């Protein structure tokens, strides 16, 4: 007979593997009783084999009537609490608590092993689940008679794929339309899988066409999908690995859960806010399960003293991963004692405390193991009381650890760092290490012993493990927490321990691709001189000052705000984006600009009789129009209500200044208007506010007034796939700093040694100042250039040393002594004031004309490559003060206007025509199609010169600016090249 390549054949492979290799029983559909939604035969068999005395005591199986009461009660508990909770905690019937599952045993408990083996894992195919129709589910898995999973299988060989399985669930498996289908009801079955021979998707709540299926795939080359399986079907890991008894038990015990979340919403009738509770059914995604299991396994095998960097993209579910990791770390054993005494979670998200606490309370019967520590007192109490999981905000952690003392060195810790790039600088990390290791200076030691203890304390401590989570690892983060590998050239690179890439998250639909619809605008200005004479100013300083001045002019704010309001209404609201629920964010460069935009946007909204309003968000207090104001003063409601109010009308536009650009997860955000220079991590984090998925969200939009496409692309490219540190930092950079400082001759070795001895012996402050002041007086005698070089090198040393000391094995008493000396000295050195060579500039000018012009729409495409980044640069510091280039105001304005102003219509006409003309250049088109991007760019530059020269008679002024002004040439080239290069290649 030929091979069975039908859907039934795939079903047979799965079922027979679970039965023959994984030890499952194979059930039949009649075992499942539709009126109770359970396999009554196996429930009864499990209880009688493990808790017969309870069955006798309650008489639950004495006769048909008692049996009916028992199963009715069990069914009600499943509906109320969910199958995962009933399995973990059992359920009460009359006077007894019935266990419905026996957990995985430890190796030291043979009795628990005996009971675990009595669990009944069962696989049933073609299960008829409804009393109202004859529909059947391809596969159901049950545990002790309780359904935990269903599967619909499809097969490419018969012309059906996973999409058909999903549609089957959405169209034919709706519990709201068939109340007899208890198997499909929320919580009663933990998860529903759609499976074909290539892909797996999962859903935890069936609700008709709104059923949301998420990928449960391994990923391929940093993207979506599953790798080829040399010994079988791509998706066989589901039944060969995930659904093994041990693996499935682990998921049910430590991952699957029902979480209750409260949310404040406005009552539409009363207008008042009220709390609404919603239940979420959680099942781990593949990468979460894989990452947590790998970290737990490495911790079991390697004990403490390890580092793990987890590069998981936005949308990866880091909060749940951190919760599952923390909860299971405290349960690891070293023989019969806990492997870790406490797990400390360091985060900058206040809401993570309640999230972890709520999630952990859903497991087993453990209570009160999570403590929120916002001071040294609460941390000490938490440790003293044996709190297993301690959560603290990153900016409190330094203060807390400085006050801990030395009594922690005999304890073992797990430190989970949420968004490691923002919470780990060298100094903070060093203090964390000192606090946990107990390596702080104490009385009774000589100076060398004390300094050696501090050096050791700066290093990654041996009595702790670090688990660092971030989507955007910087060089320092990779070097501090990444896994080292020696390359063929002898250099040591650092890589993440585990990754779930931005590329995979986008391809799997967990986050939106925020670069798909990216529109850039440019501001053109013409400034005129308002004084008769022609004063001179520093050319470089003047250009910066002019740019800042024109950007804050009322006309500039007005034009940009008008573009924002018009776009939001016509292209977002009127087009019904997100079913009419879409929100927007305006990113500004500072608080004053944010307030200006807030008032102008609200004025324009009111002018067009819009029903919507804006909210402004910034931290602290700011003087505005002669009055000190806060965001609450301007908005008219407390700051704590900003996030909730953004979900309710009339508020639709959030105007921010360095706030809500990180950690703000609002799926209703659809559009972003950027008026701030963004680079590297900040660009990724800011634009990623748009990437949260929502059932009604099919696209996003960015309108950028301040950045070009290449800058944004370069920022995202670093974190699109795996980020790798190419080599480790060179400790000799510290010697470079020292050499630069020593050239100034402001201290002696004896002074450094004497100050250290006095400082670490705790002498009076009065004994320190005379030593430090010797260097201060010598510093004041230096010329200005040497002062700049010396002070910047001191700051560079102080910034670099704690990091180098933490990540390298080198010890240096000299470096530690200098660190102490410079730490005191730098605060007493006089502040160096840069002389203002632009004084009077603003009073001598006026804004004559300005216009904000659209440059083009783009889909920014990222390269399918990993990114190598270099260690943080550690140079010698500034070489001194540069001489001002004094230039006449008329010349400064000519250059500024040349870049920022031309006849708008003619300029726009040229920008519109240039792409078509350059696409007619055969040399460029060949280079674009057949060479790499760099070669195509070189040919483009040559071709553009010829094209512009041929346009001389059409627009002399434009051509003159292009040929004579390199900055203007680059401005035009950058924009035109990106446009035509993409067009030429998309037409291939």
Feature-to-residue mapping (PLM):
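Inter-Walker segment of RecA-like/P-loop motor cores
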Residues: 361-402
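Conserved segment of the helicase C-terminal RecA-like domain
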Residues: 689-718
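Interdomain helical connector at the RecA1-RecA2 junction of SF1/SF2 helicase-like NTPases
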Residues: 229-232, 476-581, 598
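ATP-dependent helicase/translocase motor core
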Residues: 2-342, 351, 355-366, 395, ...
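Catalytic cores and motor modules of nucleic-acid processing enzymes
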Residues: 44-61, 65-69, 269-274, 306, ...
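Conserved RecA-like ASCE ATPase "motif II neighborhood" in helicase/translocase motors
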Residues: 387-419, 423-434, 442-456, 635-643, ...
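Conserved C-terminal RecA-like helicase domain
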Residues: 548-656
